[in-house]
């Protein structure tokens, strides 16, 4: 639905899904004493309900998305095209996760306090990073729509506007975390010592100071994916994996916890070093293709 220009209804269904998830958590865990299984059932059930609601609404409101009898037949060209876009996206997250695992193994050698600090700081950081994922998803849709409509002149304008929004948000997020970071990290730990809170705040602030490079990672990577060049997403993930791996193997053992704090920022910068030239390459390639098509049509 977002690709069709409707982002409000998915948000409504997401809110409904979250409310159902909370209600089912209370019922399954507190009333039915199902424990971890109850939490899993609540999550799956709420997501299933949200998916069904989206499907029903989509079929009623968007005629172009209604599946006809003829469309039930498998189309190998379409399957190949979807796999060409989807498989690289899946591999991207897998490759990035490899670097994170190697880094985490290095952090584990620093002791329980360091592990707890990274865990608490990461949870707060991930909360603020949700906005970057939203910006990326927006640009994936925007890029795909404009490439499909052959309005390549709008790509740069959209990228600029989204980047400015992300930069402003990054500054605001850093200010919030600077003044309230320790308190926010304290919400995710029990029996928090001063050393733990100071370490988690250090981790949080160092990561937040590099949110602007993260803006470009999400905005450009998702946009390139939406433009149909998913392979570049894999390569950017490889750059992130290499950065985190090098930090985990060489930097963390020497510089300790502070070295671990700089792992993700370095990964984001490494990804940007690849993604920014990749965007201009992709855009020029599309422009050349469009010019050839116009010349042939004339």
Where are these predicted regions, by residue range?
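Helix-terminus/linker motif at the lipid-water interface of multi-pass membrane proteins
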Residues: 27-34, 94-123, 127, 145, ...
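Hydrophobic faces of transmembrane alpha-helices in multi-pass small-molecule transporters and flippases
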Residues: 8-15, 53-56, 71-102, 106-107, ...
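Small-residue-rich hydrophobic transmembrane alpha-helices
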Residues: 1-10, 115-181, 214-236
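Short runs within selected transmembrane alpha-helices of multi-pass transporters and secretion channels
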Residues: 1-2, 10-18, 39-54, 133-136, ...
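Alpha-helical transmembrane segments of multipass membrane proteins
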Residues: 19-30, 55, 101-105, 127, ...
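Short loop-to-helix capping motifs
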Residues: 6-7, 35, 111, 229-230, ...
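Hydrophobic positions within alpha-helical transmembrane segments of bacterial inner-membrane proteins
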Residues: 18, 22, 26, 39, ...
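Short alpha-helical transmembrane segments in multi-pass integral membrane proteins
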Residues: 31-87, 143-210, 251-298
